Amino acid sequence: MFVVKYYRMGILDIKMRWYVARREKYANYDLRFEGVTVERNIRYGERKGQVFSLYRKSKKRLPVFVYFHGGALAGRTKGARRAFCAEIAKLGVAVLNVEYKGEVMLGAKECLEECEKILAYLKERSTTLGIDIDRLIFGGDELGAYVASYLATKAENYGIRPVGVVLFSGYYDAIRHAKENSYFESQYQFIKKFYKIDLRRASFDNSVSTYLKSMSVTSMVTEDFPSTFICYSANDEFLPEQSGAMIKAIKQKDVYLWEFKAVDKVVYHNFHLDRRTKESQVVMEYLSAFIKEAVDGGVYSNEYREI
């Protein structure tokens, strides 16, 4: 019975990877920048991979959207989000498409500490970059949503108060993820590489639970967390419980929340990347409204949509 369970999990894991690979394939299918200029590989830290690309339509001082891609442990880079970042830049905001893939391999704590360097960099270089950090939004998908959420809780230490956070198909609750998903080979490897915990050899004792809880952004959300846009699928094949955990944490602190839930059975993880679909197009319309409202004075309302 035990072997059969792992065999079935392995087959499902392969299917999940294939679905995600298809969506990644179409993420940049419509790569038209239409007046958006791109300055590539601007360094924000000393490590080799600590760079970002800057997308903008105008040279004047602009609000800024700082985005972290997903799939870093699977080898994906910021290049996989070029079309998405260019589209956001068309709204009249500067977009930083941040690379952090190398930092992920250091482990969770070290990765987050290294990613914090972007905060110090933005505080120091905002004038040079032509961005308004008083109108800053963090965003990300998958593990990038985890990084974006974490930085939103640390930004005030650098004199930055984000006006919004945008999260897609994200990862937020480490302890819940480890308990519920380590049977999947890809998720077991993620936990092993990122948290340096081998759950097939180590017991889930108090020290492991305490550590994972301390690394969960759901436990870091306070009343001062920025207004949040969160998008996910009810049929997410990779992280089915994660968005619900983050939404619960946000609601408990009375943070303004725009929640978008895809309910169609054939709409899966990171569906926003495939711009051919109506669900992705609808989400992008609402995201445009959220960004404009956030940078024009702040989001002070709650929204819920099933799409």
Where do the language-model regions lie?
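Alpha/beta-hydrolase superfamily serine-hydrolase fold, recognizing
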Residues: M1-I307
